[in-house]
Amino acid sequence: RRGIDAAQGDYLVFLDSDDAWMPDCLQTLQTVIHNNAPDMVLYAGRVIREGSGGAQMIGHVFESEQWLTVSLMKEMLISGDELNSLWLKAFRRELFFGDDTDYSSLAGVHCGEDKVQLFYPLTQAANILYIPNCLYSYYYRADSTVHSFDVRDISRKLSQEMFSVLSLYMERWGMNDRRHQQLLALYQLRMYLSVYFGVRKSCATARERQILRKYPWGGIEKQWRPYYREIRCRLSVCERIKLLAAALRL
């Protein structure tokens, strides 16, 4: 937040300290902004893994340049993680003016805190331009705080602070109806499965497996269970099997 407050330019872009922009990143964005004057620009990046010769694309959601509606972007944030990152977006700086979001619950949080920063500027945006250009290099480290799983970090990985702020913004956006609650429930269910099986895979001892099973998963399940009959059809066969295994704490 201090960086945003100190910024002087017309547009803001973000860079994690251990990542890199592609050589043509800023020039490409300057040209796109000059030609289109968008409130936000979304672009793609590549994920570089240690010991791997290839690179996986991230943020590549469409094949061609196109304008997105703000409502579509909001629905994509309610539905999953695909567009979470600040660092695959450029923002008109004015979008951050007057941000009244309470970020106090996110102090020291390293899961979901990036996504929360998107909600206020998106509320202020009138238009969004997507370009398929790969402009960012994200260096994936399996032992990083974000990607590693540990039985002592279950609560952190479930991103409950992020979901709480997202729920407040859904109400603010007028997206608190049952259809949008179903999208959120499906997102929460998939987060639950990801964390449960990610942590289970990391358990090396009987004691760790016991901690996993004793965790109060029931409170997490209550978030999506009221919508399960409606969202069940959107789950893959694999997800349904995993859900049964998690429910039995296997």
Task: Locate each region found by the language model.
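C-terminal, non-catalytic tails of nucleotide-sugar-dependent glycosyltransferases
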Residues: 159-183
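Glycine-rich, basic loop-to-helix element that forms the pyrophosphate-binding segment
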Residues: 1-7
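Short, charged, amphipathic alpha-helical segments
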Residues: 179-186, 209, 213
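Membrane-interface aromatic/basic loop that binds lipid-linked glycans or pyrophosphate carriers
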Residues: 197-250
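Donor-binding/catalytic cores of nucleotide-activated saccharide
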Residues: 20-129, 136-153
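Short aromatic/hydrophobic "clamp" motif used to bind/position activated sugar donors
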Residues: 12
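Amphipathic alpha-helical repeat scaffolds of TPR domains
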Residues: 185-194
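Catalytic metal- and UDP-sugar-binding loop of GT-A-like glycosyltransferases, i.e.
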Residues: 15-17
